[in-house]
Amino acid sequence: MLGWTLVFLVVAVIAGLLGFTGIAGAAAGIAKIIFLIFIVLLVISLLVNAFRGKSPRL
């Protein structure tokens, strides 16, 4: 589960960098939406992992 959390975080950061720095100006709106989706998935993944009470696996 922690592995997926890290994947969501990396994808969100990459989407944010591409969308918010002007590198992909035409796709900034799409990058912002993808950024928000993956941030939500990251939070859900962290909450599920916390409520399970299991130690994280890498």
Curated annotation (Swiss-Prot):
Family: Belongs to the UPF0391 family.
InterPro entries for the chain: DUF1328
Bilayer topology annotation: Multi-pass membrane protein
Name of the molecule in the record: UPF0391 membrane protein Sbal_1421
Lineage: Bacteria, Pseudomonadati, Pseudomonadota, Gammaproteobacteria, Alteromonadales
Tagged with keyword Transmembrane: yes
Species the sequence originates in: Shewanella baltica (strain OS155 / ATCC BAA-1091)
GO CC annotations on file: plasma membrane
Xref: Pfam families: DUF1328
Transmembrane segments: 6-26, 28-48
Keyword field: Cell membrane, Membrane, Transmembrane, Transmembrane helix
Predominant subcellular localization, coarse grouping: membrane
Localization of this protein: Cell membrane
